[in-house]
Every structure is written in structure tokens, then in C-alpha cells.
């Protein structure tokens, strides 16, 4: 019988694959994602699908904006995934495919995609906040919703959440927190850039 990996095991594997210093501003993100993926790897009713993959890529890319050296960002993502048994190449490919498809999705295409996702995920109903970000990224890429009012966009997110069996209140809260944290990260990076210029 295989021994269940602990969070200490995951962190040890992570540092072996990524033996670099993580800049302080990005450290919290790396730690939170590492812990979250570790917990998800032990959830029997969790399934990694294209919405989750898209959410994970979106969170990582937004919160590692300006990472130096830039080539370390890719290594960081790979290490966070690998140390928890997630395949970074599969996640990248799955995310890229969905984002590419979403750019030409009609309402019918969206409904068909959601129906297929539901069928594929039967028995796997564990919700992660990363799924919420995947939903947000999905609708953000669809031309159908580019010019709509925020209330209409929220209604669509509500409909998608319900169709996937997620509580909209949780999805809405996670998206709202995500957007707020992005803004804080932007401001922090601007302050750092300003301080570097004045030195």
C-alpha cells in the first residue's frame, strides 16, 4: 500500500525541483498554491478538468506578473504542480485549448461544453476556488460577453455555476476576492517599481 504524501513531503519535493529564492512578493502565492494543490491531490471527489486548469493558469500568470528572472516563473509553476502529482504540461494544454475555443464560443457552444463537462465529472463534485477563476476566465474570453453589463455577466456566471453544481454565492465571493487581490498585487508592484527608480 502506498504511503500518503504529507505537505512536508510536497514542500521537500518542491524545493528539490525549484532550488531558487522566491522574491518576497510572490512567496505567499507559491505557498498557497502548493498547499491547495496538495489538499486537492488527496480529494477523492475532485477531478482536474479544463475549467480548473484554466483557473490555475490564470491565477498563476496574474500573480506572477513581473517575476524576475522571467524564465523562473515557468519553473516555479512546473515545480508547484509536479510536487503534488499534477502534470504541468497537461494543465497548460488543457487551459490553452479551452481559452482558444472560448474566443469563438457561441451560447450553444457554451451549453454543449458545460453539458459535456458535467457528464465527464459525474461523481467528482469537489469545488475549489480555482474553479471559480476558471469560470471567470472562460466568460471573459467569450466575444458574447465582451460588451455586456456587469450584472449580465454575473447572471451568466451564476447560470454556469448552477449548471456545474456549484453554489453561486461561493463562486461570486471567490471571484470578487480574486479581483481585489489582483488590484492589490498591481499596486504593490507599482510601489516596488517606483522605489527601484528612486534608488
Swiss-Prot record:
GO terms for biological process: photosystem II assembly. The keyword Acetylation does not apply. GO terms for cellular component: plasma membrane-derived thylakoid photosystem II. The keyword Phosphoprotein does not apply. Belongs to the THF1 family. Pfam families: ThylakoidFormat (PF11264). This is Protein Thf1. It comes from the Bacteria. Residues 167-198 form a coiled coil. Keywords: Coiled coil. It comes from Prochlorococcus marinus (strain NATL2A). NCBIfam families: PS_II_psb29. HAMAP family: Thf1. May be involved in photosynthetic membrane biogenesis.
Amino acid at each position: 500500500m502506498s504511503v500518503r504524501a504529507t505537505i512536508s513531503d510536497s514542500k521537500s519535493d518542491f524545493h528539490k525541483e525549484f532550488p531558487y529564492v522566491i522574491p518576497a512578493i510572490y512567496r505567499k502565492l507559491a505557498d498557497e498554491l502548493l498547499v491547495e494543490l496538495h489538499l486537492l491531490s488527496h480529494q477523492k471527489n475532485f477531478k482536474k478538468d479544463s475549467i480548473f486548469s484554466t483557473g490555475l493558469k490564470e491565477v498563476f500568470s496574474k500573480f506572477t506578473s513581473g517575476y524576475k528572472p522571467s524564465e523562473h516563473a515557468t519553473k516555479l509553476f512546473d515545480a508547484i504542480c509536479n510536487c503534488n502529482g499534477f502534470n504541468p504540461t497537461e494543465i497548460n494544454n488543457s487551459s490553452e485549448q479551452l481559452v482558444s475555443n472560448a474566443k469563438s464560443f457561441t451560447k450553444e457552444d457554451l451549453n454543449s461544453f458545460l453539458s459535456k463537462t458535467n457528464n465527464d465529472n459525474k461523481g467528482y463534485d469537489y469545488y475549489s476556488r480555482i474553479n471559480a477563476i476558471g469560470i471567470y476566465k472562460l466568460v471573459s474570453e467569450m466575444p458574447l460577453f465582451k460588451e455586456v453589463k456587469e450584472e449580465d455577466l454575473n447572471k451568466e456566471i451564476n447560470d454556469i455555476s448552477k449548471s456545474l453544481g456549484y453554489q453561486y454565492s461561493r463562486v461570486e465571493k471567490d471571484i470578487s476576492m480574486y479581483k481585489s487581490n489582483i488590484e492589490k498585487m498591481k499596486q504593490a508592484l507599482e510601489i516596488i517599481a517606483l522605489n527601484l527608480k528612486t534608488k
